[in-house]
């Protein structure tokens, strides 16, 4: 029978000093036999996805204590990728994932907490906490702050919605010289109306959806908007549930509730199956690979490639379409609705466990609105956006008049009526990416699935932006942005500005972009990232020259630099001859801090999740 970890610091005469300090935090005599549960919050006023979380830690804590536990809250950092985008701040985004994972480990192990509730939301916070949960392997429940409502422009005549908006629309309009200042400002003011994670199937929402599929979050975690009153129930339930999980593990020796027991290889494959089916952000590939490594699960790019070849695209939301946002996915039945369709297509392992319903199959039976779910589920998925700008959680209780149960032409489709039988994400291989690269096929126009173009080479994101806005990129070009990988950046910047500017220049369907960096979940078009190995690690992307021909073939999962092997060997030899300057950008002016240098020293390429290679450290 496992012992409560917290007894290390709460029991025995030699722990008198620790108990004295615990008492100074408010603990009473009767609390020392209870489980101590960490409430891992990520509130910050810097990030709209987290600005409303200040009081939610206390809400969870009150439920923990009502259920017989002791709650102790702490905060992690949280970087807003949108605000950090397009300047040196983006260098810090991906490395912050490792800091979050480490800081959670530090706090939980230093204070011998027995379990956790992780209150996350945005891009690197959910993955960082997920990595920590796998590392610590103590009972955990994830509950996110929830998605932002989509922005809306209404008719001045009848008030009806004439367009839905998000952050990406604001960026594209602002960069389009044909758009007036007045129109650009209207979109800017309307694009992000409420608290919550950005309203499309971007990285934050993708990851919060995937925690449902892995089995560590409650139904609706990824889709019910942050402002809705019914989301409060997820936080209350999380507080009660984590105490139950604690007792099952520590008092009943039930290890099935532990993260590593739930997040098995089959669970990671289920999550990736969902990811491909819903056209999730390409960043999710990095984060699932990283979390799997922390869990000790052998889940690799080859598994992702295998899954992507057999799973159809069953759901589309912005940026893959301007018709649907996450709030519309919720109305169609949320993640359990998509999982239900995948289950009926025999594409899931329904025996995988979770924190709330026994098995995935049981969860689908209870929550899939097209699979016979009861009245509670039918009501829950009617939760709608309120349409009132606010930074306050649970501030409205609007409901949809009807559910979207149309599996032929609706937001969520069945396999027979899939958006495409090819999934929403694909892994490409070739001499430009021997270890693979990722494309979000759900966001690529089918006319571009096979594409050949001329290389326009840039050694940094900043140079690429300047080149695109300066009309140095033309229809038929393949924009190459290199030395932006985990080690070469360092930090593997997102390329939302270059992809948005290609659209604003009218090149969204006539150009491609290939990089060893990564993309915001808001990027769409023929944009291919995560080239592995990256340029700084000797990847072939570092040998591409201006005007080279690049061949892209999504159906055959191929990307190829049309240069002979002899020429490539000569280029590689010339690069190696540069000595210490080999595999580094030429004439790039970028200040790299000591903190980023420390990350770069251990960073791996994207095919390993851009995690740190700790095997380099000597014991």
From Swiss-Prot:
N6-carboxylysine: which positions carry it? 124
Q: What EC identifiers does the entry list?
A: 4.2.1.9
What are the binding positions for [2Fe-2S] cluster in this chain?
Answer: 122, 198
Per the entry, the cofactor note is: Binds 1 [2Fe-2S] cluster per subunit. This cluster acts as a Lewis acid cofactor.
GO MF term list: 2 iron, 2 sulfur cluster binding; dihydroxy-acid dehydratase activity; magnesium ion binding
* Signal peptide (residue range): none
Its recorded name reads Dihydroxy-acid dehydratase 1
Query: Subunit comment for this entry?
Result: Homodimer.
């Amino acid at each position: 029978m496992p012992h409560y970890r917290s007894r290390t610091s709460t029991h025995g005469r030699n722990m008198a000093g620790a108990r004295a300090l615990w008492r100074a935090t408010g603990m009473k005599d009767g609390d020392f036999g209870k489980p101590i549960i960490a409430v891992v919050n990520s509130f910050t006023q810097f990030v709209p996805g987290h600005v409303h979380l200040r009081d939610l830690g206390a809400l969870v804590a009150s439920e923990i204590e009502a259920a017989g536990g002791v709650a102790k809250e702490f905060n992690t950092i949280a970087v807003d990728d949108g605000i950090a985008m397009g300047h040196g701040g983006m260098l810090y985004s991906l490395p912050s994932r490792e800091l979050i994972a480490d800081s959670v480990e530090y706090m939980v192990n230093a204070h011998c907490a027995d379990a956790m509730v992780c209150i996350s939301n945005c891009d690197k916070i959910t993955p960082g906490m997920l990595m920590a949960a796998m590392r610590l392997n103590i009972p955990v429940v994830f509950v996110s702050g929830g998605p932002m409502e989509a922005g809306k422009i209404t008719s001045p005549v009848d008030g009806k919605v004439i367009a839905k908006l998000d952050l990406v629309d604001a960026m594209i309009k602002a960069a389009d010289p044909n758009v007036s200042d007045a129109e650009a400002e209207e979109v800017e003011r309307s694009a992000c109306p409420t608290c919550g994670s950005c309203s499309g199937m971007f990285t934050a929402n993708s990851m919060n959806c995937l925690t449902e599929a892995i089995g560590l979050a409650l139904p609706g975690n990824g889709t019910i908007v942050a402002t809705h009153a019914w989301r409060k129930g997820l936080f209350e339930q999380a507080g009660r549930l984590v105490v139950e999980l604690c007792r099952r593990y520590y008092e009943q020796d039930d290890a099935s509730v532990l993260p590593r027991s739930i997040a098995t290889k089959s669970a990671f494959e289920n999550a990736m199956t969902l990811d491909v089916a819903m056209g999730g952000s390409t960043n999710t590939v990095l984060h699932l690979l990283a979390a799997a490594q922390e869990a000790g699960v052998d889940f690799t790019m080859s598994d992702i490639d295998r899954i992507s070849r057999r799973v159809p695209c069953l759901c589309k939301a912005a940026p893959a379409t301007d018709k649907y946002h996450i709030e519309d996915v919720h109305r169609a039945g949320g993640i359990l609705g998509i999982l239900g369709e995948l289950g009926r297509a025999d594409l899931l392992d329904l025996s995988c466990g979770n924190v709330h319903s026994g098995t995935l199959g049981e969860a689908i039976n209870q929550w899939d609105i097209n699979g016979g779910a009861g009245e509670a589920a039918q009501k829950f998925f009617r939760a709608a956006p309120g349409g009132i700008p606010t930074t306050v959680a649970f501030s409205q209780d609007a409901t949809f008049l009807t559910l979207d149960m149309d599996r032929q032409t609706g937001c969520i489709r069945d396999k027979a009526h899939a958006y495409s039988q090819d999934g929403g994400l694909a892994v490409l291989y070739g001499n430009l990416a021997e270890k693979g690269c990722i494309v979000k096929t759900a966001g690529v126009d089918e006319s571009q699935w096979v594409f050949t173009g001329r290389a326009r080479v840039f050694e940094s994101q900043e140079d690429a932006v300047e080149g695109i806005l300066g009309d140095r990129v033309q229809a038929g070009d393949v924009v190459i942005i290199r030395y932006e990988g985990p080690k070469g950046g360092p930090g593997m910047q997102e390329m939302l500005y270059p992809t948005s500017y290609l659209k604003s220049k009218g090149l969204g369907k006539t150009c491609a972009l290939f990089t060893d960096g990564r993309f915001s979940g808001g990027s769409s078009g023929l944009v291919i990232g995560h080239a592995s190995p990256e340029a700084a690690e000797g990847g072939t992307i570092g040998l591409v020259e201006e005007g080279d021909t690049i061949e892209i073939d999504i159906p055959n999962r191929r990307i190829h630099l049309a240069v002979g092997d002899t020429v490539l060997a000569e280029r590689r030899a010339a690069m190696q001859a540069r000595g210490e300057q080999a595999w580094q950008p030429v004439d790039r002016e970028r200040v790299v801090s000591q903190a980023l240098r420390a990350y770069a020293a251990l960073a791996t390429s994207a095919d390993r999740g851009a995690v740190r290679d700790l095997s380099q450290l000597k014991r």
